[in-house]
Design a protein with these regions (language model features):
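Structured, solvent-exposed acidic/aromatic patches
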Residues: 40-43, 82-416, 442-450, 455
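Active-site/pore-lining binding-face segments in mid-to-C-terminal subdomains
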Residues: 402-486
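Membrane-proximal, proline-rich intrinsically disordered regions
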Residues: 23-81, 109, 360, 476-547
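Intrinsically disordered or highly flexible coil/loop and linker segments, enriched in small
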Residues: 18, 58-59, 414, 461
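Amphipathic alpha-helical surface "interface" segments used
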Residues: 75, 198-217, 268-273, 423-428, ...
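Bacterial Sec-dependent N-terminal signal peptides
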Residues: 1-32
Length: 547
């Protein structure tokens, strides 16, 4: 949590001066408190809240949001790896030994970047009967709670957003998920209201870089949050596939209803994506062998022997024109020929880590101001397919599965094709051949969890890093598909032995620690209660993935 320790120091000091001098004028009248709450138009608060759903840059050091943490989570799920060896994140580690705030960006996003501003929109928007703003704020807070607990497990819930407190009690994950559901239903009720201060044109201005003020899209997003939340507990007896399916059917059904973020691209640092050449934050990252093999028809789940038509849209070819990648903590050990090493995500050679002067050669979500998905119709179809398969409805699962792939193809062609060289753009014939390949889209009786989860992984490559990490932890990285006896994530090889972070004590990562520079400095008793000072705390499994 953000702690107002300066306030606790300055107020007693000012009071002492007041009484010592015998001044009779009230301090509040004499010295306007620059930190005092003043009412601001809710229209001015919403843009910053929405930007936090990707990355927030409000001042030096305030790089809060999923894009920042995603640089590291992406190593855990092997979207990418560092182009060298010895990186603790490639080894499924953290940076606690250096008292670092790395992996604390979602924590800061929720409690600081969004925090009080969402509370004020809900309070002031209610006073002004701007139910559309209230509903959006509640929907984003629900998403924030879900995202926060997904990566940290126990978090501060009941005592959150209390500026008078310096220390806070933590609450268990089931309570947080219940709050997510409560907020979603409250959001839907407010988003359904009309009249009073509701003004779609007014909302569209504040929501310019998000859903554009489209209430239907915000409702679809909120239903998607509910579908995600109900699908978290697939390993438990309380799992309800019908609830996942119900909310998935109310969430986005086509790509025009996707929730996405974009940037103004106008010159200031905060007007560009955190993963862009302008920001220069991903110069050392290279696509993994896992994704490259998956997109090259070399993965055991989809052994087509042919390149997936989506490959040039989401990953990079090498000088030989093929798709290869690197293994965690191994650098380019298997790619002895320079011509086998993939270009970086900005289109320069493997060896180059400096950002280029423009994003002309960048593609997909790695451009300066890309369309950056937060939730898509394709993801929702894969959620639905998994729930239907678990329920035993294989025909329904196959329909949703195929639709998810089709939606992903459409999304890539609509939003990202302009950056793909003409010679590498997919044709309708290539798309149809892929979808008609029984190795990819089998008969209903042959559909497996591996089919669904691996295609979901492809459809969320890059942007969906936090959600994919949830999925991989639900399947404990290497759980077996009950139908095939093979790993659900076929050929996925988490680091082991010397490639696994020493402090993990031989175990894989399942959570990240609370943000260091608030919790480990001020909330020591609570963290001791949770065991969060243990070197291997990050290997402690979250509640959602346990039986």
């Amino acid at each position: 949590m953000k702690h107002n320790f300066l306030k606790s120091l300055t107020i007693p000091a000012l009071a002492a001066i007041f009484f010592a001098t015998g001044c009779t004028k009230k301090i509040d009248d004499a010295f306007a408190n620059p930190n005092a709450q003043t009412k601001q138009p809710v229209e001015q608060l919403l843009p910053g809240i929405i930007s936090n759903m990707a990355i927030q840059h409000s001042a030096n050091g305030t790089l809060y949001g999923p894009q920042n943490d995603g640089l590291y989570f992406g190593r855990y799920v092997q979207f990418w790896a560092t182009n060298g060896t010895g990186n603790q994140y490639d080894q499924m580690g953290d940076n606690f030994i250096n008292r670092s705030d790395v992996l604390g960006s979602i924590w800061a996003m929720h409690y600081y970047g969004m925090g009080a501003n969402i509370s004020r929109i809900i309070e002031w928007g209610t006073e002004e009967k701007k139910w559309d703003y209230v509903g959006v704020a509640q929907a984003v807070r629900a998403w924030g709670w879900m995202t926060l607990t997904d990566v940290h497990d126990d978090v501060i819930l009941r005592e959150a957003f209390r500026p008078e407190q310096l220390v806070f009690k933590y609450d268990p994950q089931p309570d947080v998920y219940e709050e997510v559901k409560r907020l979603c239903h409250a959001a839907l009720a407010n988003l359904s209201k009309t009249g009073d201060g509701v003004n779609p044109a007014n909302l569209a201005i504040s929501d310019r870089y998000g859903n554009g003020g489209d209430i239907n899209k915000w409702k679809r997003f909120t239903y998607g949050v509910l579908a995600r939340t109900f699908n978290r507990v697939t390993n438990k007896s309380i799992y309800q596939p019908d609830s996942v399916i119900f909310y998935a059917n109310l969430a986005m059904q086509n790509n025009s209803e996707n929730t996405t973020i974009t940037w103004s691209n106008t010159g200031g640092t905060g007007t560009y994506s955190f993963w862009s050449p302008f920001r220069g934050n991903i110069g050392a990252l290279r696509q993994s062998k896992f994704i490259a093999d998956l997109m090259s028809g070399l993965n055991g789940q989809f052994p087509t022997g042919n390149v997936d038509p989506r490959a040039p849209y989401i990953i990079r070819e090498n000088p030989n024109g093929t798709y290869k990648g690197i293994r965690p903590n191994k650098g380019s050990d298997l790619l002895t020929s320079v011509n086998d090493r993939p270009d970086n995500f900005w289109g320069d050679a493997f060896s180059i880590t400096a950002a280029p002067g423009s994003d002309n050669a960048a593609r997909y979500i790695f451009k300066n101001a890309p369309i950056f998905p937060i939730m898509t119709a394709a993801e929702i179809q894969f959620l639905k397919a998994e729930a239907m398969l678990r329920k035993g409805d294989k025909a329904g699962a196959l329909t949703a599965y195929k639709k998810g792939i089709e939606l992903n193809f459409q999304e890539l062609r609509t939003n990202y094709e302009v950056s793909v060289p003409a010679a590498r753009r997919m044709t309708d014939a290539q798309r149809d051949a892929y979808l008609n390949n029984s190795l990819v889209v089998p008969a209903a009786a042959d559909l497996t969890l591996s089919h669904i989860m691996m295609q979901k992984y492809i459809s969320m490559y890059g942007w969906g890093v936090t959600e994919v990490w949830v999925d991989m932890r639900r399947y404990h990285y290497t759980d077996l598909d009950p139908t095939t006896g093979q790993q659900v994530y076929r050929d996925f090889a988490p680091p082991t032995g010397i490639d696994l972070y020493t402090n993990n004590l031989g175990k894989w990562i399942y959570r990240v620690r609370p943000r260091y520079n608030s919790e480990y400095l001020y909330n020591v008793d609570e963290l001791n209660r949770l065991g969060a000072f243990a070197p291997d705390y990050i290997t402690k499994e979250c509640w959602f993935s346990k039986p």
